[in-house]
Amino acid sequence: MFKRRLSMFMAAMGMAFSLVACSGAKTADTKSAETKAVEETTKSEAKSESTDKKNVVVTTSFLQDMVEQLAGDTVNVELIIPAGEDPHLYVAKPEDYTKLSSADLTLYHGLHFEGKMVDALEAGGVAVSKDFPKDRIGTMDEGGEIITDPHFWFDIDLYKMAVGVAATSLENLNPEYKDKYEENKVKYLDELTQLDKYVRENITSIPKESRYLITPHDAFNYFSRAYDIEVKAPQGVSTESEVANQDIQETIDFIVEHKIKAIFAESTTDPARMEKLKEGAAAKGADVKIVSGEGNELFSDSLAPKGQDGDTYIDMYKHNVKLITENLK
């Protein structure tokens, strides 16, 4: 509907432009080149509309990439939480609910990752985590409360399960493309298997005594479990949680005790938090480097914006592993 209205608006603008351009001309039938261009654009958009592609709404850049890998250009993909923004802190806008209400299919993470939108998503969406075995879903004790860890995408095996759910949902949406989606799924799953080998080879190349990953918030526990690298962060699984002085001090003591030489900022968190860790470690005689700045931050809760390094799941994972390996070896 929105596109149709936009096309009508552009056509009306074209007519207005034509009347101005033709003022004083010999015949009213004379059309400017600009008007013709507008009309061609309108026709092109009308043709695009006639293809009637289904609208798939996704909550995050991870799922946007997943759908694009599986469905290519057979669907229109609309993203709710822009790449680079923190999903834990994202507040839904009125237009987000408009997208959801007009979606033919909505895919979301589940596991309380989209907590502020969960009611709307559960009402009509598909959680890609819905088939995860319960014993594979991570939990943490935060202040005596057991919290579900939503960062499953750092366990590539779980991510593969999510791909399977997304593929089935797309096949149900567009049965005529089932063979194409199946072919793309098989290809993508093979690429993810190769990614797992890449990650394992690189992380195991880090000496065991140096294999510690310090980040601003607890987003890497699935990564830790899958690749035998101990992780620690002063903040919990959600960036909404409070950062207690005790947690900061415990992290500082951990850095000093294990002689950790590098700690990592994340693309969606405040790098100032890592400065506190560096200063605290320095006060105890430890020299620790903060790995941060454009192109040197870990991706945790979002992929990079389109066109930047890390704008696909596989590229994001390789970026993270390269950064970790280079700074901890």
Where are these regions (language model features)?
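Sec-dependent N-terminal signal peptides
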Residues: 7-13
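Extracytoplasmic metal-acquisition and chelation regions
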Residues: 2, 8, 22-329
